[in-house]
Amino acid sequence: MKQSSPTYLKHHFLIAMPHMADPNFAQTVTYLVEHNDQGAMGLVINRPSGLNLAEVLEQLKPDVLPPARCQHIEIYNGGPVQTDRGFVLHPSGLAYQSTLELGELAMSTSQDVLFAIAAGTGPEKSLISLGYAGWEAGQLEAELSDNAWLTCPADPAILFDLPAEERLSAAAACLGVNLSLLTAQAGHA
């Protein structure tokens, strides 16, 4: 019998099914930054934290007044792991002190990207989050097997061009799914 290679979902969206009980992930869409045999890492992209970039910059450099535009740049809850650490998703092409290229996207984790965004010299489009979602080896696969998530290839337009409250339904629509029509009960055929 031929063994099949595992399918990894890097650069995909995880769409929480209606029966998702974990409050960290109920009604979320998560961008998978990495997924391999060691586990997975992602950022929830539709949970505004209530903070804005100006408030974060005031904590980083209290002696410098952030530009007014920073008050309109939302910070997201990226997940329950390392919630004091920042992650910035943006289109690839710009590199900062700590940038991981992800194909057409990149993720930066150094403060210089935040100051570049504030100065108007950073990426034109970005999603800034505090914290991330992490799965140990085999954990995400088990959740997928339990029908906790739908998956689809990530779409940068959903990440950067839609308001947070539209991202979940838009990601599901990529699969032709209306989440409001799904039952909260899971099963296997």
Swiss-Prot record:
Top-level taxonomic group: Bacteria
GO cellular component terms listed in the entry, alphabetical order: cytosol
Gene3D superfamilies for the chain: VC0467-like
SUPFAM superfamilies, per the entry: VC0467-like
InterPro entries cross-referenced by the UniProt entry: AlgH-like
Pfam families: DUF179
HAMAP family xref list: UPF0301 (MF_00758)
Membership in a protein family: Belongs to the UPF0301 (AlgH) family.
Protein name in UniProt: UPF0301 protein PSPA7_0505
